[in-house]
């Protein structure tokens, strides 16, 4: 089972951009960007070096996803659990959104990319939050790729907050219990207005979801690779999409093939 979700080596010939464009593309690709620390450790470098290289890959994959016509690219950038890391590492991670968005924002604006953020941004340092808010504001009118960053995000907390708000709305008489449906619950989540991911990519060889979009990933195709995030390339992205295109998505029903 897990082998079917992992990166496969069925073809000796690399997948090409032209090949994947001949088939239906996933509208929403989500990525758990894992392995920055291990990448740095293998090279006897500080963990910050891995995070810096990982940021360069974010640029590269964002550009490529836009070229391919992907509609939404969701990136798990910082989880609610990541605060447990050493303070020096957390401080550096909090600088990365500012560095990334300051240098990359003009290109995002020019390329019609819309920046969105999910997560508890109120808990971010002021300088990080200001950079994020500026990017969201300056790209709010863009209509191309939605670049959705999960910052200080945890799916269980997201679901709990949605349930609390629904309970309050029932108590106030704004909702009746029979009004509570799956689409309604989705509308109370941070991802309200975004389609659920079609494809989830996780790098670094780990096979778990790490509290990321647990509700939204119900019928998402999963693709795992041993490649560490700083080593992830456009070719790996194409391989993930090609694997997705070979899947038979049944959504709990029977195969149409």
UniProtKB/Swiss-Prot annotation:
This protein's record includes keyword tRNA processing: no
Catalytic site positions: 34, 82 (proton acceptor)
Pfam families the UniProt entry points to: Prenyltransf
Superkingdom, natural source: Bacteria
Positions annotated to bind Mg(2+): 34, 221
Alphabetized GO MF terms: ditrans,polycis-undecaprenyl-diphosphate synthase [(2E,6E)-farnesyl-diphosphate specific] activity; magnesium ion binding; manganese ion binding
Key word Magnesium present: yes
Cofactor note text: Binds 2 magnesium ions per subunit.
EC numbers: 2.5.1.-
GO cellular component: cytosol
Subunit structure: Homodimer.
Protein name per Swiss-Prot or TrEMBL: Isoprenyl transferase
């Amino acid at each position: 089972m897990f082998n079917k979700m992992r990166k496969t080596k069925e073809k000796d010939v690399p997948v090409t951009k032209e090949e994947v464009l001949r088939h239906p593309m996933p509208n929403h690709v989500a990525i758990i960007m894992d392995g920055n620390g291990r990448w740095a450790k293998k090279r006897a470098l500080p963990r910050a070096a891995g995070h810096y290289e990982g940021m360069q890959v974010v640029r590269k994959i964002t550009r490529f996803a836009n070229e391919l016509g992907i509609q939404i690219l969701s990136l798990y950038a910082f989880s609610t659990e990541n605060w447990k890391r050493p303070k020096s590492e957390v401080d550096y991670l909090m600088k990365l959104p500012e560095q990334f968005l300051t240098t990359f924002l003009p290109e995002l604006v020019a390329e019609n990319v819309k920046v969105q953020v999910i997560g508890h941004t109120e808990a971010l340092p002021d300088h990080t939050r200001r950079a994020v808010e500026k990017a969201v504001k300056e790209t709010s009118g863009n209509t191309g790729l939605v670049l959705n960053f999960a910052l200080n995000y945890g799916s269980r907390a997201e679901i709990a907050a949605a349930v609390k708000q629904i309970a309050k709305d029932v108590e106030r008489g704004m909702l009746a219990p029979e009004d509570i449906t799956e689409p309604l619950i989705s509308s109370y989540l941070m991802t309200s207005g975004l389609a659920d991911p079609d494809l989830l990519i996780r790098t670094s060889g780990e096979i778990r979801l790490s509290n990321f979009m647990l509700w939204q990933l119900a019928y998402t195709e999963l693709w795992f690779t041993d490649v560490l995030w700083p080593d992830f390339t456009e070719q790996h992205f194409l391989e993930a999409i090609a694997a997705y295109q070979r899947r038979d998505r049944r959504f709990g029903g029977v195969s149409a093939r």
